[in-house]
């Protein structure tokens, strides 16, 4: 099973790449975490945010495999504790499907992306900056994996 983080945006600060990559290299070979960056359309003064969101959504959907289990990261989604995330991860692994985690642009995910999603997950009721989301996701996925392995990284 591969986990794909499909995120709108690019050119992250060095601390983001360093933090994200630290957890990517810790993930097991049979459950790699792959980042797919979707270029963000230029946002000009007169640009229609709704059209930009649709355009971003089309690019995200093109990045998906037909058999991917899609999880949209949405504020309105279901929140999981870290142990619950590890249980989700085990279910994903048992399904044999690749998992695609979708992170929208500044205006969120398009309706088409939300409709394609098998699940909606809320990391927090707070609005989180996109760079921080990448690092947070990578760390939480690694932490969930360590729970499944009985590794002492996670403590309750």
Curated annotation (Swiss-Prot):
Subunit text: Homodimer.
Protein's UniProt name: Ribosomal RNA large subunit methyltransferase H
Keyword rRNA processing belongs to the record: yes
Primary gene name: rlmH
EC number in record: 2.1.1.177
Top EC class, one word: transferase
Organism: Hahella chejuensis (strain KCTC 2396)
Reaction(s) the record says it catalyses: pseudouridine(1915) in 23S rRNA + S-adenosyl-L-methionine = N(3)-methylpseudouridine(1915) in 23S rRNA + S-adenosyl-L-homocysteine + H(+)
Subcellular location: Cytoplasm
Gene Ontology cellular component annotations, sorted alphabetically: cytoplasm
Superkingdom field: Bacteria
Keywords, in A-Z order: Cytoplasm, Methyltransferase, rRNA processing, S-adenosyl-L-methionine, Transferase
Acetylation among keywords: no
Binding site for S-adenosyl-L-methionine: 73, 104, 123-128
Gene Ontology MF terms in the entry: rRNA (pseudouridine-N3-)-methyltransferase activity
Entries under InterPro entries matching the protein: Alpha/beta_knot_MTases (IPR029028), RlmH-like (IPR003742), tRNA_m1G_MTases_N (IPR029026)
UniProt xrefs under HAMAP family: 23SrRNA_methyltr_H (MF_00658)
Family note: Belongs to the RNA methyltransferase RlmH family.
Entry function: Specifically methylates the pseudouridine at position 1915 (m3Psi1915) in 23S rRNA.
A family per Pfam: SPOUT_MTase
């Amino acid at each position: 099973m591969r986990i794909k983080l499909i995120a709108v945006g690019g050119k992250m600060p060095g601390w983001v790449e360093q933090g994200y990559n630290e957890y990517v290299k810790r993930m097991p070979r049979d459950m790699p975490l792959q980042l797919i960056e979707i270029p963000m359309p230029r946002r000009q003064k007169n640009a229609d945010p709704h059209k930009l969101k649709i355009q971003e959504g089309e690019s995200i959907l093109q990045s998906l495999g037909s058999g991917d289990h899609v999880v949209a990261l949405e504020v309105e989604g279901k929140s999981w504790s870290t142990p619950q995330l590890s249980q989700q991860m085990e279910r994903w692994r048992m399904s044999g499907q690749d998992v695609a985690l979708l992170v929208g642009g500044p205006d969120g995910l398009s309706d088409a992306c939300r409709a394609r999603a098998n699940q909606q997950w809320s990391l927090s009721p707070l609005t989180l900056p996109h760079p921080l989301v990448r690092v947070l996701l990578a760390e939480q996925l690694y932490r969930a994996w360590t729970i499944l392995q009985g590794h002492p990284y996670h403590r309750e």
